[in-house]
Amino acid sequence: ELPGVLGELDYPADLLWAGRSLHHLGDQRAALAAFAGRLAPGGTLAIMEGGLPSRFLPRDLGFGRPGLEARLDALEAEWFARMRAELPGSVGEVEDWPTLLSGAGLTHARTRSFLLDLPAPASDRARAYVAGTLARVREVHGDELDAEDRATLDRLLDADDKASVHHRPDVFVLAAHSVHTAVRTG
């Protein structure tokens, strides 16, 4: 678990990778500085943070109010802001990762976003991923949803319902993940 585990690793490191983890640390700038301090000269820090919300469904499902995923995104954004604010040692930070990496004494090398595009009809594996993701959203945000959106989400998750993500022919996975790299010079 970060940041304590950093002391248990062998240093200096030629490569450190942090995937979707820094946003769970109260002081992201301090965490990046700790990573930078453990890199060998010429070593690279790669972080996966940012990107775009994933999409799985058409805007209009044929039941419920159109735009469910946009409303779920808004709930997720509110949850994320609360989660960040409640972290021990939380420091508000503009999530400009190249600038944060430079501020940690690293030279920003590159940012690249990777697109995951699994068009409809989705494979069983993709459907399982979609169902798992929506089930997590239902568990975390179920009480915040209005009755219609909760019923829509429940129907999408009901494997016995032909309109669920387990059976719909229009389920897809579209996601973008950003990776930022920086190098320790000197």
Regions found by a protein language model. Name each.
Residues 29-44:
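A short glycine-rich, Lys/Arg-flanked "PGG" loop and its adjoining helix->strand segment in the class I
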Residues 90-96, 100-186:
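Conserved Class I S-adenosyl-L-methionine
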Residues 1-3:
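Conserved acidic residues
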Residues 12, 41, 105-107:
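Short loop/turn motifs at secondary-structure junctions
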Residues 5-16:
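A short acidic, Gly/Pro-enriched loop at the edge of an enzyme's catalytic core
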Residues 47-122:
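Conserved catalytic/acceptor-binding region of the Class I
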Residues 23-25:
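A short His-aromatic
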